Curated annotation (Swiss-Prot):
Organism: Acidithiobacillus ferrooxidans (strain ATCC 23270 / DSM 14882 / CIP 104768 / NCIMB 8455) (Ferrobacillus ferrooxidans (strain ATCC 23270))
InterPro entries registered for this protein in UniProt: Ribosome_maturation_RimP, RimP_C, RimP_C_sf, RimP_N, RimP_N_sf
Keywords on record: Cytoplasm, Ribosome biogenesis
Cellular component, GO annotation: cytosol
Stated name of the protein: Ribosome maturation factor RimP
Amino acid sequence: MEDRLYEGIAQQAGIAGCTLVDARMVRTGRAVALQVFIEKDETTAVTIEDCAAVSRQLSLWLDVENPIHGAYRLEVSSPGLDRPLKNLHDFERFKGSQAEIHLHGLTQGRRRLQGELLGVEDQKIVLKNAEGRWTFALDDIHKARLVPQW
């Protein structure tokens, strides 16, 4: 997704009183969906009204700016229990939670790790699992998400 589109979506979510967690274009068969994941703040759950407000705000902006060529479906929702971790603030905020991290390259023979987030130290993400303590730069991470505990 282009930076301009992502930044525009983040700005419109903010106007509607929410924060963008992630956005992505997903193709299923011939259909294309713009999936937008939002949160309210760290203590307030996203409601259906929040999703509707962001959807209305985004629809207006998308119609005027027309950054997406062709037909698409707009989907706005909360990120869910397995929310993505996108920035250093997320990794610090969810310290103590279980997370799964996929790396761009191999680190000690591993590309995927799961364990407890220990937070951020010296601008590096710290994860602990049965194999030890792991430290990564944000740029080393391809994708990361919380792993819900039942």
